[in-house]
Amino acid sequence: MSALRKSESHGRIGEAVTYAKCWMNGIPAYHTGGLRSNFAGSDLIVETGDSRLKLWIQVKTGAPAHKDSVYLTQCAGDEDLHGEKFAADFVVFVNLDARKAQSHSHDGALNFEHLSFYVVPRADANRLYHDVVTNLAAKPKRDGGRRKLGNMAVHVPQEQMLEFRDAWQRIEAARLRT
């Protein structure tokens, strides 16, 4: 068996634990089965009161670069300055403890205690992301040149995310309204 790449396994771990946390919070969620093109980039589908309507959840997983920040996702490039990055109804940002993310070796040492969850409605996720990317693009490099946004990790200060930490009730409230 080939060795697991952390860049891939962290994303899969984030999706799996978000699925579990939904059910732990009474939210009936299901995997999209890799059919993301049919589900606006979503990883999970949530049942609502109306069997014809579903909520979509996108999961983004990573380790924050700084203790007081929350990792959102990688920037695709200048195209992220225009339009919306996220299309799902909610984005769950799963942040791994940075030390444990680097040191674990798929031996069971990575646990729920090493994870933080930020449950963010689409409009808020897009606003937070856009604000950070716009500021990064406007900030010149030391040599005065323009910063390249492609593949840049996007973080926000943790204090901007406090209202979203473990906010599973937001999904439940939206589910019951629908």
What are these regions (language model features)?
Residues 1-40, 45-178:
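Mixed-charge (Asp/Glu-Lys/Arg
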